[in-house]
Swiss-Prot record:
Subunit details: Likely a component of a DCX (DDB1-CUL4-X-box) protein ligase complex. May interact with pic/DDB1.
Keyword Metal-binding: yes
Organism field: Drosophila pseudoobscura pseudoobscura
Gene coding for it: ohgt
Pfam families: Yippee-Mis18
Name of the featured protein: Protein cereblon
A cellular component annotation (GO) from this entry: nucleus
Length: 616
């Protein structure tokens, strides 16, 4: 809508107000607004439909007539159904190679300036407090359009400019998107809890899998390769950290009384949890030089059948230091899985990342870890075991062993884990990870952290007491291609095959910012082209990776924070650039996954990507 049309609408508004002013005036002479806003709503809807027609013309340019497929195999165009809901034909073509190239890192295209964003590494605030001020240009779901417009019209009547100001096209689209996405955000946390049956009813067919992408080999980059020991040391806490000795494992099945906190992420035994907290909460409980053991529970993982129980891990502090602001830096390591009865909790538990101020204690029970060795180990003959190390004799030796047992081949293979470990090792070689533990119990947790499973699968892995079952579940997903999706709008961001280890602890590590907020970060070589925008300015302050500057990245569609871009500032440092995706803002899904967020699917997202690029 140009300036002349806006001026004409303003003149019409003034004329209508002048003619109706005397009849509608109150005792003070001020105009009394009518109760029925239907006329104004319809006028705003007309402006939106005018904008939608422009976007539909853009769709027709790329995809053919609205509602029809231009050519066989191309993406269909969604249109309103009879009941007003947006719908789309299933199917679609594979994304082009241009969609899967490396991001060129330019900041002029698709940048979002959000001063004071609380997702910076040096921000003291929580991500849940952020607000979106700018929205990308894409369609609004029809089933929530009228509700958003009703709210806008009622607000606009009490503001300067009235309805005419609402009808400015850019202002209108921005505000409607803001309202709709505020609803999307409130529902996004439950996106992974949609039942498979409901998903199948909504989308009967799966989109096609994405095409293969050219691999990236970090070893081919020139320069000095980054020392992966540095992030594991969490050196951004400063040099004033003192070692706290002592690693204590509690007896399985025993009950202990200890300090407990809550955490928004699932921690597995072996993971490092850095945090910043008031040291007075721990000083009274620390005895001598022994590290304090406390409990961390995960309220978001509470199973429906165990509504009165919390699951978590015990953690032991192994380093601490003062930051000079009445807060203490701590580094702890998760040791064992635990279960807590909610009736045993004394006090109000608080999140460890939200600057807790009160102590909360409870009884915790140490959960067991059952591991059954391979069935053939019990009949292993020492004189012939040497043949297992000869590749040409290994299969013959295995068949000989199986023939001498009462169990069928399927049973032996079901409980054999060496093949699963070998397949996992080969898959992780691509990520440059060579720190796999040898202990089966520790290895099962290590694989869960580094193979990137869905949240539902991770919860299932955590709750099982059988190491063998945990490894079997891991073996079942090794061949699946998975992606990172935006948790808010379901846009694809990056491929899990592009993960690599910037820390010796693996591809997924938790880091803490100066405000005490803990970010679960996944490091990837690259993101899908045109999937991200930028916010704010690059900075090296409090960088988790020494020698790199960080820059906040946002989802290109919904403008929500999804992570950071890291660029080398020191010469000859490799890799030159990589990305850290925030675990709280992304979810893991299969390639071509039909899982939806509020009814928007893979096909619509790829269509909107083209529209967004064209309108910019």
């Amino acid at each position: 809508m140009d300036e002349e049309e806006t001026a004409e609408i303003n003149a019409q508004e003034q004329e209508v107000a002048g003619s109706a002013g005397e009849a509608a005036a109150g005792p003070s002479g001020a105009e009394v607004q009518p109760n029925d806003d239907s006329v104004a709503v319809e006028r705003v809807i007309d402006v939106f439909e005018e904008t939608a027609e422009m976007e539909a013309a853009m769709i027709e340019r790329f995809f053919g007539p609205s509602g029809e497929v231009a050519e066989e195999g191309t993406l269909p165009v969604p249109g309103p159904s009879a009941d007003g809901e947006g719908s789309a034909n299933a199917g679609g073509e594979r994304p082009s190679e241009e969609d899967i190239v490396l991001d060129d890192g330019t900041e002029s295209d698709g940048s979002y300036n959000r001063p004071g964003s609380d997702m910076s590494l040096d921000s003291p605030n929580s991500e849940d407090d952020s607000d979106v001020e700018a929205m990308p240009r894409w369609m609004i779901p029809q089933n929530r359009l009228r509700f958003a417009v009703d709210m806008m019209v009622s607000q606009a009547r009490n503001q300067d400019g009235g309805i005419a100001a609402l009808l400015n096209r850019d202002n209108f689209l921005q505000r409607v998107r803001s309202m709709v996405f505020s609803q999307e955000r409130r529902r996004s946390r439950n996106s992974d809890e949609v039942s498979p049956e409901a998903e199948d009813d909504e989308l009967p067919e799966h989109p096609p899998p994405p095409p293969p992408r050219p691999p990236i080999d970090i070893d081919m980059e020139e320069g000095v390769h980054f020392d992966t020991n540095l992030p594991a040391e969490h050196s951004y806490f400063g040099p004033n950290l003192n070692r706290v000795p002592g690693v204590n494992y509690q007896e399985v099945g025993s009950t202990h009384h200890m300090l407990i906190f809550l955490h928004q992420y699932i921690l597995f035994p072996g993971e490092v949890l850095p945090f910043m907290i008031d040291g007075s909460l721990f000083d009274d409980d620390m005895s001598g030089l022994d590290g304090l053991i406390f409990a961390v529970a995960f309220p978001l993982m509470k199973p429906p059948e165990d509504s009165k129980k919390l699951y978590g891990v015990t953690c032991q502090i192994y380093e601490k230091g003062d930051n000079g602001r009445h807060l203490t830096f701590y580094k702890s390591r998760a040791l064992q899985r635990i279960v807590i009865n909610c009736s045993d909790i004394k006090g109000l538990p608080q999140y460890i990342a939200r600057n807790p101020t009160n102590k909360c204690h409870s009884k915790v029970k140490i959960l067991p870890e059952y591991f059954l060795p391979e069935p053939l180990k019990c009949i292993d003959m020492g004189s012939m075991s040497r043949f297992r190390d000869i590749p040409s004799m290994r299969d013959k030796y295995l068949r000989y062993q199986i023939s001498s047992t009462p169990w069928p081949v399927e049973v032996c293979q079901e409980y054999a884990y060496e093949d699963i470990v070998e397949r996992a090792r080969k898959k992780l070689e691509v990520h440059k990870i060579d720190t796999m533990p040898k202990c089966p119990i520790q290895m099962s947790f290590w694989l869960v952290r580094n193979l990137h499973l869905t949240e539902k699968m991770m919860s299932q892995m955590f709750l099982t007491d059988s190491v063998n079952l945990r490894l079997q579940l891991i073996g079942g997903i090794l061949k699946e291609e998975t992606l990172f999706y935006c948790r808010y709008c379901n846009s694809s961001l990056a491929y899990c095959s592009d993960l690599f280890a910037m820390s010796k602890h693996g591809v997924q590590t938790q880091y803490c910012n100066p405000g005490g907020y803990i970010h679960e970060t996944n490091t990837v070589y690259r993101v899908i082209s045109h999937a991200i925008g930028y916010s704010g300015e690059p900075s090296t302050r409090f960088s988790w990776f020494p020698g790199y500057q960080w820059h906040i990245i946002l989802c290109k569609f919904c403008a929500q924070h999804v992570g950071w871009e890291f660029k080398a500032v020191e010469p000859n440092l490799a890799p030159k650039m990589f990305y850290g995706l925030a675990g709280s803002s992304v979810r893991i899904g299969k390639a071509g996954d039909s899982a939806t967020v509020n009814g928007n699917n893979f096909v619509v997202r790829n269509m909107l990507r083209v529209i967004s690029e064209g309108m910019e």
